[in-house]
Amino acid sequence: IKVVNISFGTFNKEGNNKKLIEAVELLWDMGYVIIAAAGNNGPEYGTVSIPGSSKKIITVGALDDNIKMIVNGRITKNYSGRGPTKECVQKPDILAPANGIYSCSNGIKSGYSYVPKSGTSMATPIVSGVICMILGINKEMSNIQCKKLIRNTAIDLKMEGNRQGWGKINPEKMVN
């Protein structure tokens, strides 16, 4: 295992989140690529969820949150968590598609095994998958090199930094 996908988060106001941040940063320091969702509490400043607020890890926001969609059972738009964090770190780091991504379902409500879902929890596995693809090509690449590759190949969307981070993930350029 080299990549850890974290498609969940907690609110900054909840209990003792220091241990969660410490745990993901320990994994990062051990060489794992940690990729976490920015959360769906935007669009206000300082709404990136924990552990996505960690300065070390890669935090993923929703590329297409400007379209009305159902997220966590409510109709919303402009929901992607935005920085800066309490430590004045600009987040998210990167954006990926988050609208209508097919994912597993328990089938109870829908009767289907897969259903479309939306949110930063759906965008995060896209980035994790791209990183896995890159590591398949270059197995010796470090987590820091992965983060730099994402940054250096991102498509700048000309949005505020606390909205887009480095921009949209660009898998094609990452491979070339």
Q: Where do the PLM segments sit?
A:
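Catalytic-core environment of secreted peptidases
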Residues: 65-71, 77-122
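Solvent-exposed loop/turn segments at secondary-structure junctions
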Residues: 10-13, 40-44, 64-68, 85, ...
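Structural detector of well-ordered beta-strand residues that form the stable sheet scaffold
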Residues: 33-35, 59-60, 95, 102
